[in-house]
């Protein structure tokens, strides 16, 4: 395993064989399931008379469609109720662990798996959700998959995949005050483009990542897919082990010491060979805001929306489309853009540390008149921990709504949606047209602290002015 990257080692250890097509048949150590992409997969198994091969390696929760205001059953939305009932039935029939609403462990799938200790270094992880790359923060190789692949994993615990190249992205130095993990990943995507990572796994490295806690690393890995990479990961270290130790599904006792020794062995070697290496300086990264309709259309909060001629030729068409859709123009400051709705939450930024940073901004201040602002914890555990610290009271005193866990306005498969031409400041991961529920709604991505700042000021503003 000399000169190997973590990706190479984990891939090779989980390779079942090479198929006639040339694809690798890869064993999946953990399969995460939710209510949106699984019903058809379970139905396909039934049609073929198949059972779930390894139910003990499958864990389910409900997150995408759950309302965050009133979670009483049956849901008002009939389709949402049907979807959760289908998941309940499928899990019961197949002996799959299911964390339902009220279990104490329900939440966004990419939040609950790490906090339960299910996500561990060296694993291969799959889920029918684009942002499965989040789990790479632990040194796992994690893929988002489609419904037919969900079926394949349920039936065979394997996926047929092409091996990726590995790009090392180093970020070195200490982030300036008011600059967060969300700014790091938005800056990377802005620089490399939304297609820059196609065909790659991204290894995030450097002193900046060494200084990050696990929740910050999850934020970065969560959005690897937005930069075109199939997955992103950080090598495990003592920060990883400290986070995992004592969690529900983490190894215990003598097994813990064995696990750590093995986790150390699968880290990228010092002389590992990469297909590409790109280096960033943390000091160059500003609080970042997206202005357009892709996560790559980002600028520093004090910068101007770019002129077409400042962009690469292949980016100009999408930029022109973004100017029209967003009703923004080249050379306009993003700072001062009026905001209608502020959303703090999602699998990108719905964890405890995200809420803590936003609460620092909200404390002793109040949401601007005419702005709707709400906070959605990423899980029942996050909600409980935040309430134990009094964060809910801080937010409510500042005029924010405090909600129940769920995906919420990240994708608007639930009642949390923009209306008409509303523009939101959002801590989520996608700003596509119509992403937040209105066909003409507009989304500006930023860190939770920046969202809180926008809520207080009623417009895009620099969080550093409130620190």
From Swiss-Prot:
[4Fe-4S] cluster binds at residues 347, 407, 410. PANTHER family: 3-ISOPROPYLMALATE DEHYDRATASE (PTHR43822:SF9), HOMOACONITASE, MITOCHONDRIAL-RELATED (PTHR43822). It catalyses: (2R,3S)-3-isopropylmalate = (2S)-2-isopropylmalate. Gene3D superfamilies: Aconitase, domain 3. PROSITE patterns: ACONITASE_1, ACONITASE_2. It comes from Trichormus variabilis (strain ATCC 29413 / PCC 7937) (Anabaena variabilis). SUPFAM superfamilies: Aconitase iron-sulfur domain. The gene is leuC. Catalyzes the isomerization between 2-isopropylmalate and 3-isopropylmalate, via the formation of 2-isopropylmaleate. Keywords: 4Fe-4S, Amino-acid biosynthesis, Branched-chain amino acid biosynthesis, Iron, Iron-sulfur, Leucine biosynthesis, Lyase, Metal-binding. One of its GO terms (molecular function) is 3-isopropylmalate dehydratase activity. Its EC number is 4.2.1.33. Its cofactor is [4Fe-4S] cluster. It is an enzyme of class 4 (lyase). GO terms for biological process: L-leucine biosynthetic process. This is 3-isopropylmalate dehydratase large subunit. Belongs to the aconitase/IPM isomerase family. LeuC type 1 subfamily. Heterodimer of LeuC and LeuD. Pathway: Amino-acid biosynthesis; L-leucine biosynthesis; L-leucine from 3-methyl-2-oxobutanoate: step 2/4. Binds 1 [4Fe-4S] cluster per subunit. It comes from the Bacteria. The lineage of its organism: Bacteria, Bacillati, Cyanobacteriota, Cyanophyceae, Nostocales.
């Amino acid at each position: 395993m000399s000169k190997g990257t973590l990706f190479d080692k984990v891939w090779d250890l989980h390779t079942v064989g090479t198929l006639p097509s040339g694809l690798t048949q890869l064993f999946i150590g953990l399969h995460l399931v939710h209510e949106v992409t699984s019903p058809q997969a379970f139905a396909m198994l039934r049609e073929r008379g198949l059972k779930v091969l390894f139910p003990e390696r499958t864990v389910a929760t409900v997150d995408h469609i759950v309302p965050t205001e009133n979670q009483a059953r049956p849901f008002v939305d009939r389709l949402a109720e049907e979807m959760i009932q289908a998941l309940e039935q499928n899990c019961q029939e197949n002996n799959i662990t299911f964390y339902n609403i009220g279990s104490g462990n329900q939440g966004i799938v990419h939040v609950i798996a790490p906090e339960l200790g299910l996500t561990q270094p060296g694993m291969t992880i799959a889920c029918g959700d684009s942002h499965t790359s989040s789990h790479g923060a632990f040194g796992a190789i994690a893929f988002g998959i489609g419904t037919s692949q969900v079926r394949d994993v349920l039936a065979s615990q394997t996926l047929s995949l092409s091996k990726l190249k590995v790009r090392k992205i180093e970020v070195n130095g200490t982030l300036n005050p008011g600059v967060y993990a969300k700014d790091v990943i938005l800056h990377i995507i802005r620089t490399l483009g939304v297609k820059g990572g196609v065909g790659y796994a991204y290894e995030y490295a450097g002193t900046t990542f060494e200084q990050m806690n696990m929740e910050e690393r999850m934020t970065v890995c969560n959005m690897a897919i937005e930069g075109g990479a199939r997955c992103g990961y950080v090598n495990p270290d003592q920060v990883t082990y400290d986070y995992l130790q004592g969690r529900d599904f983490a190894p215990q006792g003598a097994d813990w010491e064995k696990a750590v020794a093995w986790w150390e062995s699968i880290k990228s070697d010092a002389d590992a060979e990469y297909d590409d290496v790109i280096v960033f300086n943390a000091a160059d990264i500003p609080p970042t805001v997206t202005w357009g309709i892709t996560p790559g259309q980002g600028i520093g909060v004090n910068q101007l929306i770019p002129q077409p001629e400042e962009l690469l030729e292949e980016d100009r068409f999408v930029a022109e489309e973004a100017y029209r859709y967003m009703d923004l123009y080249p050379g306009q400051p993003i700072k001062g853009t009026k905001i209608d709705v502020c959303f703090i939450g999602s699998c990108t930024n719905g964890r405890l540390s995200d809420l803590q940073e936003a609460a620092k901004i909200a404390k002793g201040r109040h949401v601007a008149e005419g702005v709707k602002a709400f906070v959605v914890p990423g899980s029942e555990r996050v909600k409980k921990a935040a309430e134990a610290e009094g964060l809910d009271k801080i937010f409510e005193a500042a005029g924010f709504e405090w909600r129940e866990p769920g995906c919420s306005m990240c994708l608007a498969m639930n009642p949390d949606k923009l209306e008409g031409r509303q523009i939101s400041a959002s801590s989520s991961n996608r700003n596509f047209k119509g992403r937040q529920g209105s066909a003409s709604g507009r989304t500006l991505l930023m860190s939770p602290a920046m969202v809180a700042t926008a809520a207080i000021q009623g417009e895009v503003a620099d969080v550093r002015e409130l620190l």
